[in-house]
Amino acid sequence: MVLIRVIANLLILQLSYAQKSSELVIGGDECNINEHPFLAFLYTGWIFCSGTLINKEWVLTVKQCNNRRPMRIYLGMHTRSVPNDDEEIRYPKEMFICPNKKKNDIMLIRLNRPVNNSEHIAPLSLPSNPPSVGSVCRIMGWGTITPSKATYPDVPHCANINLFNYTVCRGAHAGLPVTSRKLCAGVLEGGIDTCSADSGGPLICNGQLQGIVSWRGGSCAQPHKPGLYTKVFDYLPWIQSIIAGSTTATCPP
């Protein structure tokens, strides 16, 4: 397992400067090692993403993190180069997606076997209600910490951002639909944001998983350019149906 980790880290370092397809936290600080027991690191050998453990057997992320390559899922990870004692590796047993990636950027992954809850592994609660505009929410991930040149840290970074009305994002990014199952969040002054390799990571508001890092237009952390996050609350029936074993679960219209 140590040899696998060494090889994986070398590949990540080699590929990090070419990474373009997913969204790290700019303007944040190193996360506390005990702050993110639900945070999953998804690695396919070409790109890496984040995800959120929502129970012992399921991880929630976004569709764009599936590049059809074999995926390893690390739980309980903090420092990429040095495994925690309770760190675990799993593989996808099943992946469930919604059609139309731009409209429904969400993916539910069933792990090949359940993880063990521990000091650094524990699920995050799904939302009981949608988040309120004006909420201060938490973002985190191993994505790039510099917007102009990709610089990927060894430990995840965390930051606080604000939740805005969706119309703010419509005004900031051309071509967005009038209505959307997305949340709009960021810092209008710029300087704090998710970015390359943060895709699939959590937007945490009031201690619950309210959003998933999904999409942005142009460069990260720009003034008046908040990002878009898949609104988890709108997908609760779909998520719960799949976990319950439904083969006919449909995405929200």
Swiss-Prot record:
* Covalent S-S links between cysteines: C31-C158, C49-C65, C98-C251, C137-C205, C169-C184, C195-C220
Q: Which CDD domains match?
A: Tryp_SPc
Signal peptide range equals 1-18
Q: In which tissues is it expressed?
A: Expressed by the venom gland.
Quote the subcellular location field of this record: Secreted
Looking up PROSITE patterns in the UniProt record yields: TRYPSIN_DOM (PS50240)
What does the UniProt record say this protein does? Snake venom serine protease homolog that may act in the hemostasis system of the prey.
Q: Name it.
A: Snake venom serine protease homolog HS120
Origin organism of this chain? Answer: Bothrops jararaca (Jararaca)
Instruction: Provide the organism lineage as a comma list.
Output: Eukaryota, Metazoa, Chordata, Craniata, Vertebrata
